[in-house]
Structures are given as C-alpha cells and as structure tokens.
Amino acid sequence: MLSSGDLTSASWELVVRVDHANGEQQTEITLRVSGDLHIGGVMLKLVEQMNIAQDWSDYALWWEQKRCWLLKTHWTLDKCGVQADANLLFTPQHKMLRLRLPNAKTVRLRVSFSAVVFKAVADICKVLNIRRPEELSLLKPSSDYCKKKKKKEKNSKEPVIEDILNLESSSTSSGSPVSPGLYSKTMTPTYDPINGTPALSTMTWFGDSPLTEQNCSVLAFSQPPPSPDVLADMFQPRSLVDKAKMNAGWLDSSRSLMEQSIQEDEQLQLRFKYYTFFDLNPKYDAVRINQLYEQARWAVLLEEIDCTEEEMLIFAALQYHISKLSQCAEIQDFATKSEVDEVEAALSSLEVTLEGGKADNTLEDITDIPKLADYLKLFRPKKLMLKACKQYWFVFKDTSIAYFKNKELEQGEPIEKLNLRGCEIVPDVNVSGRKFGIKLLIPVADGMNEVYLRCDHEDQYARWMAACILASKGKTMADSSYQPEVISILSFLKMKNRNSSPLVASSLENMDMNPECLVSPCCAKKHKSKQLAARILEAHHNVAQMPLVEAKLQFIQAWQSLPEFGLTYYLVRFKGSKKDDILGVAYNRLIRIDAVTGIPVTTWRFANMKQWNVNWEIRQVAIEFDQNVSIAFTCLSADCKIVHEYIGGYIFLSTRSKDQNETLDEDLFHKLTGGQD
C-alpha cells in the first residue's frame, strides 16, 4: 500500500494561466496534480483555488504548445499527454469577433473559438437570421486587401472610424435556443416581399435577438452606392493570378478559430463560399437575399468577375433602382397579391437557374423528348479565316447537336454530332449590335473543342441557349426547367435593350445619381459622367417597374448568367507540367485554365469522379475519374486543404434536398472535406 509520501511524489506542479473578464491581466495559478486527474478535475481545482464568484461555465483549457482545446473533461492528464511543462490557458470559449459582411457592414458579436468553423458559422448565421449557413464561411482578408486598407488609413488626414453594428449581448453558443421563426416553414413573411421592409408583426419572433434592438434592416436593406474614391481605394484583381490570391484565406471548416491562430476581436469576412444558393425564399430570406445581392454587387464593381459593358450597364441600372426603392420614405408596409405573385414567379425562375430543384412536381412526358431544328451559323476559331462563319441546318435532340449541309439532308448522316454533356456554355451576346452567339467548349481527349453558334434573333437564341445549358448538365428539353430557363434568358435580353426616349432625356435633367458609383472604375474612365448617366437611365427604363426584391433577384440572376460565375480560382502546378496553371473550381466541375491567356484547357466533371485524396507529406491533391483519367496537382496560391475542402463541400451540397427540413449531416460534411491529416 502506498504511503502519503509516495502519493506526494507521484504528483507534480502544473502552472495554468487564467484569462479574466473586463481585460484584467492574466494570473498564473499553480496546482498540484497527478496524471490520473481528469480535465474536469483540473478546472474544478482552478476555480476553487481562485475563489472568485463568477460564472465559469464557458471556460475551458487551451494547450498552447499543441494548439488544441482540452474539451474532453473525462480524459485524464496522462491520456491527454499533459505533463509539467505544458503551457495551459484557462480561457472563455466564446470571444468577440468582428465580421465584415458582404454588404461591407461590420458586426461585432460573441463567437465560439472552440467549435469547428463549420459549426461556428452556423451559429453566427442563426444570430444574423441567414438560412443555409453551409453556403457561407469565414475568410481571412488577403494581404493585398490589407495593404490597400493600411495605405488608405495612412494617407487619410482624419482617423478612419468604422461603423460597427455591435451585437455583443448575443451569444452564438451551440446550445442556446433559437427562435423557431428562423426555420419555421409555416410562418408568415419576416418582411414585406415587395419592398423588403421588415414586417412589424414578425419582430416578436426575434425578441431575444440583438437584431431587434439594433434595427435588422441594416442587414436586410442594401447600402447606398459607394463613392468613386472608395471604389478606387479598394483592391481590384487585375489577372486570374490576383483572383487566385483572394481565395487563399478561407479558414479550415474542420478546425476551430483558436486552432487557426485567430485572435480575439480580429476582423474576418463572412462570405458566400459555395455558389449553390439552395431554396431561396423571400418569405424567410430577407437578410440572405440582400447579402447575396451585395456580394454580387461588389464582385461586379471591383471586377472580381468579368462582364461586358452592356452587362455592366444592366447591373448599374438595377443598382440605381434598388438604391432608390431602399431609400424611399413612402414605402408602405403591405403588398398586393399580384405583386407577391410576381416575386414568387421571379423566385421560381431563379431557383431553377441556380439548381435549386424543379419548379413544380408535374410529371413530364419523357416518351417524346422535344427537339429543336433550325438554320444557325457555325464558326470554329481554330480554322481562322475571314469567312469561316457558315450556315448549316442544326438539329438539337437529347443532349446532342447534329448539323447538316441543309434541311433536306436531315435524315442522312450529319456532318458532325456534338455531345454537350459536360461542356462549358459561354454566352456571346451584344443586343444593341444584334449579336446572339453561343460559345461551346466541349471536352475532348486532348483538351477542349471550341465551337461558336450564331443565332438570328432573341427567341431563337433563348431556345437554343436554354437547351445547351440543360444538356451540359445532362438534362433534356423534356425537363421542367427548360421553359423557365427560356423565359429567364428572354427577360435578361429584354433588360439589355436600349431605350433612347424623351423620358430618358427628361430624367437626365432631374438626375439624382452619381453614375461613377454604379460601375467599375475601368468602365467609369471610358465615358463622360453625363453620357454614362444617360446610358444607365436607358437601361433603367426596362427595370423601372420592378419591385425591390424582384430587382435583387434579377441582379443575382444576371450575375449568375455571367460566364465566370461560380468559379473560384487557385494557382496550381499539375504533375508533369513545367508551368503554372489556374484551377477553376465550380459546383459541378474542375477547369484547367491557361494562366496567361485565360483560355480553358480541360474540364473534369464531378459526376465522373471516382475518388480524390491528398498526399499530406508533399501537399498534393490527386483525383481519379472514369475512363482511367487521373490528375494530380500541388497548390501554389493556397494550402491544398482549401481546394480539397471546396471539392468535398460542393459534393456535400449536391446531396441537399427540400425533404431534409434543413437538417445538415455535419459528419458527412467533415468526412467529405476533412481529409486525413
């Protein structure tokens, strides 16, 4: 039997630093412990020895050397590997964090620094009333963004005072009750479906939320357009490599903030990371739709995504319209049934476009798949000649296009048959120039087969473009999303029509806009202010009757129709290659892009992926596809874990369905994205 002296010799001293509330200086507590003492016992000893009456329930032990939390309170010190030289910190798990939202507003709230980022983001979104938190994540600003900000502050004569929405009283504790209104399927709208005004009757749902006290319209309403000076001072990517650098800062969703060296009160960005916006609904998504609109708006203004001048003017007109409606003091707190129906119709179209599921449950007659047949012009850039554009008779059926010398030869062998499943579809449209083109990038063994189709008018273009988009996803024109896609394309083309009318001239005289605030700096430099304003007002004529929420949805849909939409770029080096390439990650595919020319080289579909993994020793991502195709690459602009998580994240999001009642399989997410490091 051991004597008391033996017991004393088996124990040892453990020094623990303690964080105190209200910014008081840390204190060091020395405990006498033994290896069989569990973590909960250590914390109990600490509290008893300090003898300070306060709530210690949020405190936990953080191990500095191992950079990990000791959250399994039933584990012993021996099992954890804690010895006398361990540097332990007894600190709150929830700390203040500043989050810059997509609308450029900063909120300050209490966030769990011990939960994995995936869970922390879900809790943050509950506080902010944003559904589908799995689409968002936290981004550490790039060094280029920070340098621009510091330079601006240095050159400023006055101190920069940031407008912060302080939600300090809120807690994102995982166990805290959340208002059922956030996820209720039967609740009435949380805000007016037309003008976006929060409905007073619904504010009772958020009685415990700090947003009630601080006017949640700050998050649900769009912000005024930024001044040209503000735009000029912000970081704008000039190349695909610059865009790749912007995506290096995504946090690891499988690790906590503390494990990733995030400090208390540090500023991070909350962003939509995955471009699959599921189940958007104006009844419940006031904040979500507005933040999505704001992220799209800033992406256009800062040229994070390329668009034509014609498209830029459409975006400017929609911004102008949304800004006017948002600032209108006479907005009424009611909506007519017809107005609600308009928004629901716009939403239904948007939902189909964004892969949110079918618009209705009507069973299609799949025994008779529709076909398109018409004369179109064909152009192949690789056979570059002055008269390379030639007219053929085209037949579109299933997911393939065949073309013939003329209509009479349709029953014979086609000149060529193009299978569009898995191809890239790029619009090439200039409405004012009567140019309606469709660029097809079709994957072949040695890269991409580039083909241009030229249509004669809007209706023809809308039908063929919609068919191409569906075929690229493996769907036919029998799918219920075909007609909404056609309508959506026609609607967007209608917005692009220029209207030079006396009304525009009179509006110009009473102009209340600064046009340079509504377009990118590069676009603003090309035109005089009055000329730019006139063109924006011409475009505005086509959207002037839109309700506020529909205008935001149209902006999102126009953003979604841009060729670069949904692509996240990374600088990589493919195995066996001697030069760097850009890897584009989208919701359903990977694209290898030439870093110099920006031209897509090869596309690989997730649907054809058999497996992917990471060699953590050499930080190399390896992916195996059908037909014995395999690729491997190292990431140069970011950690390979970020790209690995993007691939797994998109596959995870593809498993969502409306029947799930918004419950997420968090274990599946970590299984697909966590890796084996």
Curated annotation (Swiss-Prot):
GO molecular function: actin filament binding
Phosphoserine: modified positions: S170, S179
Database matches in InterPro entries: Band_41_domain (IPR019749), FERM_2 (IPR035963), FERM_central (IPR019748), Kindlin/fermitin (IPR037843), Kindlin_2_N (IPR040790), PH-like_dom_sf (IPR011993), PH_domain (IPR001849), PH_Kindlin/fermitin (IPR037837)
Listed GO CC annotations: cell junction; cytoskeleton; cytosol; focal adhesion; ruffle membrane
CDD domains recorded: FERM_B-lobe, FERM_C_fermitin, FERM_F0_KIND1, PH_fermitin
GO biological process: basement membrane organization; cell adhesion; establishment of epithelial cell polarity; integrin-mediated signaling pathway; keratinocyte migration; keratinocyte proliferation; negative regulation of canonical Wnt signaling pathway; negative regulation of gene expression
Keywords attached to this entry: Cell adhesion, Cell junction, Cell membrane, Cell projection, Cytoplasm, Cytoskeleton, Membrane, Phosphoprotein
Keyword Phosphoprotein assigned: yes
Family matches, as Pfam families: FERM_M, Kindlin_2_N, PH
Entries under SMART domains matching the protein: B41, PH
Residues annotated as domain PH: 377-473
The keyword Iron-sulfur is assigned to this record: no
Protein name (Swiss-Prot/TrEMBL): Fermitin family homolog 1
Species: Mus musculus
